[in-house]
Amino acid sequence: FSQNQKTEIRDKFGINKNDICLTFVGRLSFHAKAHYFPMYKALQEVSKELDKKRTIHLIQVGWFANDFIEKQYKEDAKLICPDIKCHFVDGLDQNQKNLILSASDIFISLTDNYQETFGLTPIEAMAAGIPALVTDWNGYKDTVRDNIDGFTVPTIALKSGSSIDLLYQYYSNIINYDQYIGYVSQRVAVDIDVTIRKLKEMILNDSLRKEMGKHGKERAKSNFSWSVVLDQYNDLRLSLDDIR
């Protein structure tokens, strides 16, 4: 995307040159994707230390499963992070999503849900040339390199086997899958203090963001572009042929 296109999209959301724009991409679901509280709380705390002439914007690109979830997101945003300009955008518009990513300063995704596997959105952000702040969760650990392409934030969970009761209820059809992942996610916590420190470091250091964004873009191209991935699949096919 051209610089003019990036400027236009920032102008559309009222994001000034000195403002900071963070973008989250994914399903907007607090029980089945990522709970918004750590993100909202950390941004609000960081905003207290910013120059009053600078505003933090959070663009959440995704979709809501129902009206109740949408209502909770928007009401809680006003309560938890009143000094953050929150924008909600349709994540099904791929061109708009990619343009917003390219015009953003930081990608943020503090997922805390067991259904999250590889996670494609951090790679999309890296390909757009912006640094990422993500949790050290599942596939995210294999995409974003801590202190290189961005920062990873620790997560804490109850010890192994602590959710057997919920698993029993799920397999017994006492609760459905949606309820199961919601209940299990309550047994995971994101380290908000570390999130605040890392956010502050990224927001206050323009050169760090640019350097991390550069590394991330190089990594996305060299490790995750289709040509590279297809070659890896072909190598796997050949190795399996040898085994057979």
Where are the regions that the model predicts?
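Short glycine/serine-rich donor-binding loops of glycosyltransferases
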Residues: 119-122, 140
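Short alpha-helical donor nucleotide-sugar binding micro-motif in glycosyltransferases
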Residues: 91-94, 99-104
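Short hydrophobic beta-strand element within catalytic cores of glycosyltransferases
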Residues: 131-134, 144, 151-152
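Acidic donor-binding loop of glycosyltransferase active sites
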Residues: 102-115, 130
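Conserved catalytic-core segment of nucleotide-activated headgroup transferases in glycan assembly
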Residues: 1-91
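A short, well-ordered alpha-helix in the C-terminal region of glycosyltransferases
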Residues: 194, 201, 208-222
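C-terminal alpha-helical cap of glycosyltransferases
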Residues: 198-204, 226-244
